[in-house]
Amino acid sequence: HEAIDNGCDMFCVHGPFEFRAIEIYKGKPIFYSLGSFIRQPYQQDIVPWETYSAHKFIDRDYPSENPIDTKIEDAKFLLERTGRHPASYFRGASISCEYSDSKLKKIIIHPVDLGIDGPLSDLGIPKIASEEVANNLLNEIAQLSVPYGTKLEIKDGLGVIKLEQ
């Protein structure tokens, strides 16, 4: 709210891998997270020491603190220790905003699917979400946004937020 109170026209949060609520504050959108748009887990050749340290893999006989020394086997080890990322991390959206006379009139949410259920070669690459994935994501966004008074309509696989005139 403070950013908008100080002149920001839109505020987007980045960091959470999952979609969160959308709020319209003083006619300006706040996207509390747009989910993931491109994601490439499990595909790294090197897992940096900081990752080991963050996950407290103290039982691993790690030969060096040099990230260059970590190889693909370490990525496999990390996956075994942390488990698979949830499917919700592999969904997101592209947003388009329509303005008239410098005022926001409509937000259109285009759901994307990052291929959690597809082949590894497609994992993390954004594609237009199927009707099922799109509807699930849009219904979730609609529910998350209710406490903020944001009404989301679902039409033809897109989410639409119309602002009062």
Where are the model-predicted features located?
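Short, conserved, surface-exposed binding loops centered on an aromatic residue
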Residues: E2, A21-I24, H85-S88
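A short C-terminal boundary segment appended to hydrolase-like catalytic domains
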Residues: Q43-Q165
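Active-site beta-loop-alpha junctions enriched in small/polar residues
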Residues: F17, G35-F37, V112
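Active-site environment of divalent metal-dependent phosphoester hydrolases
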Residues: F11-I24, R39-Q40
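Short, Asp-centered acidic motifs that coordinate Mg2+ and/or phosphate
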Residues: M10, P29
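Short coil/turn connectors at secondary-structure junctions
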Residues: K26-K28, L104
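Divalent metal-coordination and catalytic microenvironments
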Residues: G15, Y32, C97
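Active-site-proximal segments of metal-dependent phosphoesterases and phosphodiesterases across multiple
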Residues: H1-G7
